Amino acid sequence: MLTLFFSLISLPYAPNALEPVISQETIEYHYGKHLQTYVDNLNKLVAGTEYESMPLEQIVAKSQGAIFNNAGQILNHNLYFMQFSPVAANNHLPQGAILEAINRDFGSFEAFKAEFEQKGTTLFGSGWVWLSADKDGRLIISQETNANNPVTKGLKPLLTMDVWEHAYYIDYRNRRAAHLQALWQIINWDEINRRYAE
């Protein structure tokens, strides 16, 4: 019997709670099938290795090849899915420390959003666009291809948007930019502030 070192995270919302921004069907495929496959693969790959007892962040920082790809995708998706809350929630605008940092480093929230969306729209192929903080708390927007994550560069990931086609094709078809613009409606800025403060 396979030992489970990693398991699928529990979502803090119902599968239909992010509609109409992200449909229940997309959640069922993206979370229930894609992410579950990465978890299953990683459990098989790390069995009997030094990685089986490491936290995901360490595996991503130290591994290569298939272990890195699957661990990276789990870490990326965990951060992605846990940053959302239903459209009806009242926490979808940044405030506090993260808003101060956004204004300091990008000039305004609108300027930050424009740069973030531009980086997400222009990333060639599959990957992620990230807002991260460096060791001094400065904010950085980066494009990361495939399973890459800013932790490999010594940064603290705060917010991400998935630009792999499986993240948006059911709901938006080839309209990646529309998908990115819509996601702001479900970002839980309380969670982003918590990550920034860690």
State each model region's role:
Residues 2-198:
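Feature for soluble, non-membrane regions of globular proteins
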